[in-house]
Amino acid sequence: DGEQALQASLSVKEKLQIALCLEKSGVDIMEVGFPISSPGDFKSVQTISQKIKNSRVCSLARCIEKDIDVAGEAMSASNSFRIHIFLATSTLHMESKLRKNFNEIIDMAIFSVKRALRYTDDIEFSCEDASRTTIDNLCRIVEKLISCGVKTINIPDTVGYTIPNELSFIIKNLFEKVPNIHKSTISVHCHDDLGMAVGNSISAIQAGARQIEGTINGIGERAGNTALEEVIMAIKVREDILGVSTNINHKEIYRTSQIVSSICNMPIPSNKAIVGSNAFAHSSGIHQDGVLKNRENYEIIDPISIGLKKVKLNLTSRSGRAAVKHYMNEMGYKENDYNIDELYTDFLKLADKKGQVFDYDLEALAFINKQQDESEYFSLKFFSVQSISNNLSTASVTLLCGKKIYTEASTTSNGPVDAIYQALNRITHFPIVLQKFQLVAKGKGKDALGQVDILVEYKKRKFHGVGLATDIMESSAKAMVNVLNNIWKAKQVNKNLKNLKKQ
């Protein structure tokens, strides 16, 4: 379902990579494709069903014989699999889309279930647009489907129209009015058009649903689907209220989220619950002080529990002395190594100008007192890039290093940005490894600025760089020069500290 949000279909290899991540995460069932839709999807379902051993694979099919047969064929190599059939049951869909009455819908559903049972005894049936289906009709078809052998009844909020108490009412009515309801697992499949997919899913659990359908990062048609990582952690954190648990390996959540984001080329919003970059970040001085004293003061989830290493304290003008001391302590400095009052005063000045301050900035303030607006050691004077065939590029850069100017041309590189970075590296000889490159448009149209944010590793330390220009190559070059200056400042700190120790 999540693939419907993408501008381009995923390859078989990409889908398999995601499926293996889901298996490692411990998901019970994964719906891996709609094999009738294309030869590529058939191949994906076939390949994944052969590789996955610890999760049950599932294939989607309409109430059409050919769909069901192809779904069964695609998963025939798997030891155990599920066929998921769907058919609309709301009056609106029956009349305007299917042109059928409810009795005909029931007949189609029963025929399709019997067809699917030829391939597997694990059948799931979705009453499409169930949340807008009259409760009497829904109860009637659910009872007949269970009698036919359907093991999982799915209640989709197909257009994200329902609010939590409505979905809870539907689920409770099924348990009250369908006599054989306990022979089947009740599932819900919620969309996020009104921003209530997760809330609806939790409400359904409280009403008796025991399967939640969703996607990693909530990607999906229109506004998306239930974000699995949010439901999973809600169940874990509020098990005292919900009284249920999952088989998920929670420490795989963050890693899986990042992999899905990367493969699908869908960045995770910084304020995204559970997996956003700000989910465990603290900027307020009061909050930072509280977290340092006891994490539970301002965090209901331990970041380690989802695969993150530690809490993130953003150093901004809102940070207090406690956060500054914490960062200095993390870098191995004792309080008598620096003057906290002077450092904090300089820190606030820098934070007002720079926005976010990093650990190496604190070192520079404490030991060489170098402000961001002072002249930098490295300054980009000129650059040019030439792209040739087969995505290869060469670059030439002129860099001011202190008072000396150096010009260097890179050898053939894999792309223009890499060519620029190689040329800069030939001048500075800093053994850096690029770990993250992010481009964000600032504004609209041809004159929009492009901001490049990069993260590199240098001698086991992380350094950030930012570049802003209308030309992406220039933004990229400026970002790397920013990194080089940050590294240079850190090197100066080390020199000063060594000199102090000699004295």
UniProtKB/Swiss-Prot annotation:
Its main location: cytoplasm. One of its GO terms (cellular component) is cytosol. GO terms for biological process: L-leucine biosynthetic process. Gene3D superfamilies: 1.10.238.260, 3.30.160.270, Aldolase class I (3.20.20.70). Signal peptide: none annotated. Residues 1-254 form the Pyruvate carboxyltransferase domain. Catalyzes the condensation of the acetyl group of acetyl-CoA with 3-methyl-2-oxobutanoate (2-ketoisovalerate) to form 3-carboxy-3-hydroxy-4-methylpentanoate (2-isopropylmalate). This is 2-isopropylmalate synthase. It comes from Buchnera aphidicola subsp. Uroleucon ambrosiae.
